[in-house]
Amino acid sequence: MDETQGPLAMTVHLLANSGHGSLLQRTLDQLLDCICPEVRLFQVSERASPVKYCEKSHSKRSRFPGMSVLLFLHESPGEDRLFRVLDSLQHSPWQCYPTQDTRGRLCPYFFANQEFYSLDSQLPIWGVRQVHCGSEILRVTLYCSFDNYEDAIRLYEMILQREATLQKSNFCFFVLYASKSFALQLSLKQLPPGMSVDPKESSVLQFKVQEIGQLVPLLPNPCMPISSTRWQTQDYDGNKILLQVQLNPELGVKNGILGAGMLPLGSRLTSVSAKRTSEPRSQRNQGKRSQGHSLELPEPSGSPTSDRCAGTSWKSPGRSFQVSSPAMGAHLHLSSHHLESGARMKVLNRENSFQKLEAETNVDTGLTIINSEPRQTYFGGFPRDLQTSQPPFCLPASSLGVATSKNNSVLKERVSPLPLAGQRDLGTRKTISECLLHLQVQGEEKEEDEEEFFI
């Protein structure tokens, strides 16, 4: 298999109740360290408050778990790794996932020889399978309802900017990471007609994207910002999705500005989905789809706001169709200029900026995620706008001015006279300071000409 390495385009955020994050992270680390220690796919965050889920009635329709994680492992002579993994899944805190109903009948779409395990009813189910040839695989599978399968393929091709590998008529996958002996995949599986999907509310898929302005109007459900670099939406079956905008200071790639050799996002989206039908089924059934839910943003005091289900952390957005309307294209285009100005300021300190972009943070509270040894611990937090009680639908230009004044004070301190012992480097430091001030003045002039924009 061809090697596909580098930063992961997808991570899976698992939301645990308060006080249970460390245990969940350690449990996953112990399970995965012997399989793929070089890949950190799962990030654990703790909720601000316990969650109570509302059960939905589906009028005698079977529901299948929306997400699973399957480990395809070798069993070489003299090695007991496969049995050690199975043994871990059969002990606390893991629980065997029931594949039979209350009458003892096998649930649809489960095979008699398959066993699944789970840590919580709202977390993915896990399974282990033995393979005799090829590389070992960790596969995250999203189960799609029969009518949504083709649309889901187009959606994830558009987000990942790569074509899916079609293995069967009802199964496809994306290779996210590959080495000579291991592969990480995201797969889509079509369910039989009449079977609905049970989305896992405590599981959130996060994807890294280069540009958000052109992507938002093409999404099937409302997409709203929850921080300066993260936007939230959901797929056709209700799986929560986070889109993290990548601003790479090392390559000079800003939001809306592409580096050499990179195609515009619009052309890439067209080329990837050109083989699919021009009119998605979702547009024909738009009225039948449920509205998207939004991550609950805690109040400044720390207490979460209430919503339609007591204690639940997802709620329906008040302005569901404003974000994805055609008129929003111009406003989203303006937002890319402001993000571009913010990216220019981050060039002043590349190391700090890079750490902020790479840091994984709590998608529910905005605090640092729970990490356990021996993996590296990240101390970056969510941008502070996640701590506000309302989503940042409106971002006035004056807010950028506040940041500008703060940066001016920092630059003035850098240009202050040096002590006598450091006068030998005065010429060099003056040159650097003048360059920084020149960049800052350009940012101020651009901001004065722009009006406030709305997302």
From Swiss-Prot:
Protein's UniProt keywords contain tRNA processing: no
Region (Disordered): 270-322
Polar residues composition-biased segments: 313-322
UniProt cross-references to Pfam families, sorted A to Z: FAM124
Domain of life: Eukaryota
Phosphoserine carried by residues: S49
Keywords: Nucleus, Phosphoprotein
PANTHER family, A to Z: FAM124 DOMAIN-CONTAINING PROTEIN-RELATED, PROTEIN FAM124B
Family indicated by similarity: Belongs to the FAM124 family.
Name the UniProt record assigns to this protein: Protein FAM124B
Protein encoded by which gene: FAM124B
